[in-house]
Amino acid sequence: MEKNVKKEAWLHFCVSSIGGFMGAYAIINHCDLLASSQTSNMIHIVHNLFEPEHSLLIYMVLAALVYACGNVTYVLLHKFIKLDTKIISLGLTSVAFILVSVLNFVENSYLAMLPLFFAAPIQWNDYAGDAGYGSSTIFSTNNIRQTVTSLTSYLIDGDIKMKRKAQFFGMTLLFFHIGVALASVAEIFWARESIWLGFLPLAVSAVCCMWYKEVKVFSFGKKSEALESIVEEQVNI
């Protein structure tokens, strides 16, 4: 069991590099638009209601709806598809990268980023409870909080569980920003076409996923109730 948890943790770290790449690519190449999150978009929606010009409002709402559809799709996949959803998530992300490359000619950044608005929440949901921790692979706020609070608790109390928790969230942050660095360097040379470099962390994650699953594509069991309870307690948005 311990070995499997370690494998799941490494899978989580690798997938976090995809999340970092997606977030950085969107921000750098599409007017600071973060396709991995809806916080800024929802703020812009409300703010736009009080502006005299509403030309972008429909695109903002569309982005929010597509993001919501990504969450709905995750639930449907999780409940009705026998294939392992972690693998499906990576497949959908690869399709999203291809669609983004096609839509790059569109001047409207909201339209160009719609595939990432859809794929990001599916990845988030699929990898949120890895190794028993409620950690997101697509943005960093909660991961920073968990790293700092866990490390502080460990330094005060010497609790080894807090040390392991800080290590997990810290490694997630490290790999996330490896993805950010990849997107940043790629943009220098290929601008918007740098989306194709996203297949590098995707390929690494796919190999890690197969290693974790021991090359079994079909899922034959569920997480233990104990692990589910841990995830339920720690997942926060």
Placement of each model-derived feature along the sequence:
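Alpha-helical transmembrane segments of multi-pass membrane proteins
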Residues: 2-237
